Amino acid sequence: MAEAAHNIVTARAEALGARLPPLVVKAERIAATVMQGVHGRRRSGQGDAFWQFRPYLPGDAASRVDWRQSARSDRVFIRETEWEAAQTVALWSARGPGMAWRSRDALPTKQERADELLLALAALLLRGGERVRAFGAPRAFIGRAALAPLAGFLPEQAVIPSDPRLPRHARAVLFSDFLAPLEETRAQLAALAAQGLRGHVLQILDSAEETLPFAGHIRFEDPAGGAPAPIPRIEALRGAYQAALARHREGLAALALSLGFSFATHRTDQPPELALLALFQRLEGS
């Protein structure tokens, strides 16, 4: 059973990897300018000026322990540098039954598109010398060869975007449909902001979730296993549904902005390159 699950994960990772090159090639026009140091990367003295300690966590390398600081208390501390924090981008894509949905076979699921964008962005960041973290991973992914291990780790990500290992002032990029109640998302983003993180939120939806193109009697089923909801004339609800979605999206954008995150949307029937390039430009401007 475990071997079968591993094979499925490997196959998905390989499929994602096979789709990466076109995205990376088109986005390297932006990455080329990044390589020249446009955003002020501090190459000299990278590890000299540390400015923060955090408690040791399982999975941290012993070589990163600051024994002098640790000797002053009954806790073990990890030393982190300003350069390390500034160069770290933490990536997270939501999992769950709702993300595994698509309205028609010609489209990717929201999960597939989220993972595709996460890995494509990671490829660009790794090429530019950034340190990439996945929420829940014990250590950073560094160097272009780290893309495959990152893809393999995606099914093991933290269930919610929370990770006490992330260095203060790192940037976070979150991929999800963000259809949960606003207060739930607010709590998650507020916790990241309190940790010193800022970043970007990308809402990924299926086109049918925006337009509600159905007509007649429709029976909606909860992907999480809840009771089905039969609706006799779905077209009569289209306007109210779209208005509610617009209010939810406006709320997402407002709370993200209030906590130091930018907000953008993407549909699975749109080219992934559009979202990737816009997101990469935002990262380089942050």
Label the predicted regions.
Residues 1-45, 55-63, 69-71, 78-286:
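Exposed, interaction-prone extracellular/peripheral surfaces
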